[in-house]
Each structure stands twice: as structure tokens, then as C-alpha cells.
A protein has these predicted regions:
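Long, well-ordered mid-to-C-terminal structural blocks that present hydrophobic/aromatic surfaces
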Residues: 65-97, 102-105
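Intrinsically disordered or highly flexible coil/loop and linker segments, enriched in small
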Residues: 59, 161-168
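Helix-hairpin-helix/helix-loop-helix acidic hairpins
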Residues: 28-82
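Extended compositionally biased segments used for macromolecular assembly or nucleic-acid engagement
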Residues: 1-35, 42
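DEDD superfamily 3′-5′ metal-dependent exonuclease/proofreading module
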Residues: 8-10, 34-37, 47, 51-54, ...
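Long, highly charged low-complexity segments enriched in Glu/Asp and Lys/Arg with interspersed Ser/Thr
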Residues: 166-182
């Protein structure tokens, strides 16, 4: 299974026999031992706790998304609510993020690697936390730096517009990025 949340739901809803039938594996061919009821209860309890954490995460993401709609809609549109919140956190405030050049926005979150580069001459970081953006994730490894530079540029523009309460240009910025790298 690819999705951890779905896996937890399957554990909560079905027993071992149902799961084996679903994936078309016989009881003899399956790995592992049969668990007694006393061992199954802690596993199910843990699965419930994990499920509750997933639900809490969704709730928090919804809250952050709503908050970002009001505070900085352009940054949210360009990079998503969670990444926008992390960038503002690393910068210290929306004001500080808006004052940063794109090159600094690009390596936010990679300060340790930057100082290692300055101290020892190691390779400089190409990106910080913006590596989590889908455009960078989908790009080939050798294009990560180029995509990160363009993305940081658009984020820096969006931050300036949001801080100085200009008009909404997030869609235009995102469209430019998708046209170039999408």
C-alpha cells in the first residue's frame, strides 16, 4: 500500500483473513505469525492513535490554509499553505520574508549547509525547505537548482505584494512557473 493513512484504515476495519483475501494471498503463503487477541489489541489501539493524528493534521492544515488566505494569499497560491507557513516561520515574519532577496528565500532552511559551504568549501546548497514544492519534487535532479531559483523568485515577489497589500497576482505567478517547468 502506498498511502499510510489508508493502511491504518485497513488495519482498523478488517481482520487478517479479509486483508489476505483482498490481496489474493493464501494463509499459508503469508508471512508472519498469527497474533493472539492480547497482541492484537495494542496494535489496534496504536492504529486508532495514528488515525487520530492524521485527522488532527488535516484539521491543522485546514486552519493554516484559512489563515494564509487572509494574511498572504499570493504566497499561498504560489507555494501552498504549509510551505508558505514554513517559509514565514524560517524568515521570522512576513515583513522579514518580504525584505529578503530571492537567493535568500531559496536557501531558507538550509543554513547549516550554507555555513558548512562557507567554512569548509563544501558544495553550496541549491535549495532549502522549498524542496518540498511539487515543481521541484517532479523535476529531474539536475534541474532542481534552476526550478528552485525560479520558484524562490516568484515567492519573493509574492511576499512583497502580500506585505505591502498589493493586488492578487498569485495565479499569474503560479501560471508562469507551471508554463516554464510544468
Amino acid at each position: 500500500m502506498q498511502d499510510h493513512e489508508k493502511f491504518v484504515m485497513e488495519i482498523l476495519k478488517k481482520d487478517k483473513d479479509e486483508l489476505l483475501k483482498e490481496i489474493k494471498v493464501s494463509h499459508e503463503d503469508s508471512m508472519g505469525a498469527d497474533l493472539g487477541q492480547e497482541n492484537l489489541e495494542p496494535i489496534k489501539s496504536l492504529a486508532h492513535q495514528i488515525y487520530d493524528l492524521y485527522q488532527l493534521r488535516k484539521l491543522q492544515e485546514g486552519y493554516i490554509s484559512t489563515l494564509m488566505d487572509g494574511l498572504c494569499p499570493n504566497i499561498k497560491t504560489v507555494c501552498g499553505a504549509l510551505l508558505a507557513a514554513k517559509l514565514i516561520e524560517h524568515a521570522g515574519s512576513l515583513k522579514r520574508l518580504s525584505e529578503m532577496p530571492a537567493s535568500t528565500v531559496q536557501i531558507l532552511g538550509a543554513e547549516k549547509a550554507l555555513f558548512r559551504h562557507m567554512r569548509t568549501g563544501a558544495k553550496p546548497p541549491r535549495h532549502g525547505i522549498i524542496i518540498n514544492h511539487p515543481l521541484i519534487s517532479k523535476a529531474p535532479e539536475k534541474m532542481h537548482g534552476k526550478v528552485a531559483r525560479s520558484l524562490a523568485d516568484k515567492i519573493a515577489i509574492a511576499a512583497k505584494v502580500d506585505y505591502f497589500q498589493g493586488k492578487f497576482i498569485g495565479d499569474k505567478l503560479k501560471e508562469e512557473l507551471e508554463k516554464k517547468f510544468g
